[in-house]
Amino acid sequence: MLTLENLSFGVQDEKSQKEIIRNLNLTIESNKFVVVTGPNGGGKSTLAKLIAGIEKPTGGRIQLDGVDITEKNITERAQSGISYAFQQPVRFKGIEVFDLLRLASGKQLTITDACQYLSEVGLCAKDYIKREVNDSLSGGELKRIEIATVLARGTKLSI
């Protein structure tokens, strides 16, 4: 379960402090799929970065399964079971989709397991498993492959 208590984040510009997120309270139960929507510049990406540990809140607390992770860095949060998929998927020249999934899983991964992850994100595994992760893939294909790597990690919380 993820709990945000009075979470705030602000940035200093040349004149004043600008609050991006102010006193947000939110609880997300385990094994739930939640979508955060809002206008451009509304703080959605900032919220994701705060949870992942890429940004530090200016106030409030973040708890994962009852453990306060507010002061943990991005590596410690990843070790706690939080994974983060970037808005723009990373391209890896010279690495095939299967190898990327194997690296993401952190364990020996069979072709069958890798194909299952690709199928779960709507890709025909036989068409992608041996493809190189490069500019030949569309943005949508790359995003699906990135989500498959998040699934392969088997984390508690995927952002």
Model-derived features: positions:
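Conserved structural motif at the start of ABC-family nucleotide-binding domains
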Residues: 2, 19-23
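ABC ATPase NBD coupling module
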Residues: 68-83
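The feature captures the beta-strand-to-loop junction immediately N-terminal to the Walker
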Residues: 37-39
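Helix-to-loop junction immediately C-terminal to a conserved catalytic motif
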Residues: 52
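Hydrophobic anchor residue at the start of the ABC signature
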Residues: 147
